[in-house]
Structures are given as C-alpha cells and as structure tokens.
Regions:
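Anionic N-terminal interaction surfaces
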Residues: 1-15
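Glycine-centered tight beta-turn/hairpin loop motif at sheet-sheet or coil-to-beta transitions
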Residues: 6-8, 23-25, 60-64
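Residue-level detector of beta-strand structural context in well-folded domains
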Residues: 9, 16, 26, 55-56
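Helix N-cap / beta->alpha transition motif
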Residues: 14, 29, 97-98
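Phosphoinositide-dependent membrane-docking surfaces
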Residues: 18, 27-43
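Short, isolated positions in well-ordered beta-strands
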Residues: 18-19, 65
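Short loop/turn motifs at secondary-structure junctions and domain boundaries
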Residues: 19-20, 48
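Acidic, Ser/Thr- and proline-rich intrinsically disordered linker/docking segments
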Residues: 36-98
Length: 98
C-alpha cells in the first residue's frame, strides 16, 4: 500500500521510495535525496511544441536522476504541490524546488 499516490501525474511514494511510472518506471531512495525539483523541457518542431515534465532528484553524492512525470499543462505545478507538501512533512531533509 502506497503512502502517497498521484494518479494524474503518475507519482507514487512507497515507504522511503519515490516512484514515477510515466514513460517507464523510475525509482529513487528518498533517504539519499538531498534536493528535488520540477523541470519543464520544451521542444519545438515546426509549428508544434512539446513540453515534457521531469522531477530531478539530486542525491547526496550530487548525481542527478531524471524521473519523467505526466505534463497536464499549466496546472502541473499546482497538482505537484500536494506531492511536495507530503515530502516536506515526511522527508524534511530534502530541499524542494529550485
């Protein structure tokens, strides 16, 4: 049973692990994460643009892990706030945001 689940963004927190399952499954141990932030990459192709959302987890050894999440448009940051609130309350050692 997951302690936190966001089906919209495809994020799970299970015990001490952050799991994303959008475009594959990625897992990181939250006890080893020092910094976590949201990054949006916009790719332009002709007249169309594609926005990809990724959580970047920086471990204490300064290695960065990219964890894709579902981009739901302009409300992605608002939806992600509940995940950050949970992490803030249960993993206070993690620096959240930029």
């Amino acid at each position: 049973q997951a302690s936190f689940h966001d089906d919209e963004l495809k994020i799970i927190i299970y015990k001490d692990h952050l799991i994303t399952y959008y475009r594959g499954v990625r897992t990181v141990d939250l006890k080893q994460v020092a910094h976590l932030y949201h990054h949006i990459f916009t790719m332009h192709r002709g007249f169309a643009s594609n926005r990809n959302s990724t959580l970047i987890a920086v471990r204490s050894n300064n290695k960065k892990y990219q964890m894709p999440i579902r981009n739901i448009g302009k409300t992605t940051d608002v939806q992600l706030q509940s995940t950050f609130d949970y992490l803030y309350n249960h993993f206070p050692h993690i620096r959240l945001g930029m």
